[in-house]
Amino acid sequence: MSDSAMEPQNPLTSGDFTAADEPFRLFSEWLKDAERSEPNDPNAMTLATVDPDGLPDARMVLLKGLDDRGFVFYTNTESAKGRELTAHPKAALVFHWKSLRRQVRVRGPVERVTDAEADAYFATRPRLSQIGAWASQQSRPLEGRFALEAAVATTTARYAVGSVPRPPHWTGFRILPVQIEFWHDRPFRLHDRVVFKRENPEIDWEKSRLYP
């Protein structure tokens, strides 16, 4: 027997993940696996919202915060997703790690992070990304690349000295999950699916397995 065969497996990342009784720790373990396996952006997730007419909208964003409250990403509040979340503060997320044959789905209401949280994260961003947050009128029509580069140059000159402050229209959103589903590929499409549900953060999660 090889040494690797003798090593105890982590039930949260092995085929026994269905025994987990709490989703956030399980998600954290899966994300760590993805950070070791995925070639690009293991924290990438599809964010789904709805527009004023109820038409679904989706795009890729990056997970930038995770705790037992929920999943956080940052954006321009005047962008399409920012406006949609302000008008209809509910969303869904999908993480798909192709190299691991795993998927996680998240659904729940959305809240804005505090100004202190947004300030703290903005301060960690590269300076050019901070400049871009001011220069880009996200989701609005752009005449051409030159117009964007001119806005970047103007903003760079404006903040040539000192730190770049966080724009008032730039903040984070936190998805407060009421449902988190874990999916793991199995042969012949006999996949493992486990879903955790709760109506609010004050109660315990209810777990159930689902047919593939």
UniProtKB/Swiss-Prot annotation:
Disulfide links within the chain: none
Reaction(s) catalysed by this chain's protein: pyridoxamine 5'-phosphate + O2 + H2O = pyridoxal 5'-phosphate + H2O2 + NH4(+); pyridoxine 5'-phosphate + O2 = pyridoxal 5'-phosphate + H2O2
Highest taxon of source: Bacteria
InterPro entries linked: Pyridox_Oxase, Pyridox_Oxase_CS, Pyridox_Oxase_N, Pyridoxamine_oxidase_dimer_C, Split_barrel_FMN-bd
Recorded GO MF terms: FMN binding; pyridoxamine phosphate oxidase activity
Pathway the protein contributes to: Cofactor metabolism; pyridoxal 5'-phosphate salvage; pyridoxal 5'-phosphate from pyridoxamine 5'-phosphate: step 1/1; Cofactor metabolism; pyridoxal 5'-phosphate salvage; pyridoxal 5'-phosphate from pyridoxine 5'-phosphate: step 1/1
EC number: 1.4.3.5
Named cofactor requirement(s): FMN
SUPFAM superfamilies recorded: FMN-binding split barrel
Position of the signal peptide: none
Binding-site positions, FMN: 59-64, 74-75, 81, 103, 138-139, 183, 193
Gene Ontology biological process terms from the UniProt entry: pyridoxine biosynthetic process
Residue ranges, annotated region (Disordered): 1-20
Residues the record lists as binding substrate: 64, 121, 125, 129, 189-191
Pfam family, one: PNP_phzG_C
Enzyme class at the top of the EC tree: oxidoreductase
Cofactor note (record): Binds 1 FMN per subunit.
Keywords: Flavoprotein, FMN, Oxidoreductase, Pyridoxine biosynthesis
Family recorded in the similarity comment: Belongs to the pyridoxamine 5'-phosphate oxidase family.
HAMAP family xref list: PdxH
Quaternary structure (record): Homodimer.
The protein's role, per its UniProt record: Catalyzes the oxidation of either pyridoxine 5'-phosphate (PNP) or pyridoxamine 5'-phosphate (PMP) into pyridoxal 5'-phosphate (PLP).
NCBIfam families, per the entry: pdxH, PRK05679.1
Protein name as catalogued: Pyridoxine/pyridoxamine 5'-phosphate oxidase
